[in-house]
């Protein structure tokens, strides 16, 4: 599987994943967020622990799919822009993951902030 390393590291979830499952993945990956994709691995957005918390406070259930709370305005890069990742991390200290997209918004990879420089 082309994207198995992203799935294995709990950095990406299908849009039908429940809020509860997403929160478990975010806890496991220790990055505060996950990328969200459809069945064809087309990028749909990001879900952070903050989005989950706000959704639960506003009455969402843990069984609701993350497609209901996905942030479609998260920072992304195109394949030919990977070198800009460090600049984005410096400009946006709250960002821990940057999805790398190809033509048609297919998720190709995720750049992960160096944990030694993670926002505290």
For each feature predicted by the language model, list its residue ranges.
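Short beta-to-alpha loop/turn elements within the nucleotide-binding domains of ABC transporters
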Residues: 17, 47, 64
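Short beta->alpha transition motifs characteristic of CBS
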Residues: 28-31, 35, 42-57, 99, ...
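Cysteine-rich, disulfide-stabilized extracellular repeat modules
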Residues: 9, 43, 62-65, 107
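Short, flexible segments with low predicted structural confidence
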Residues: 24, 40-41, 61
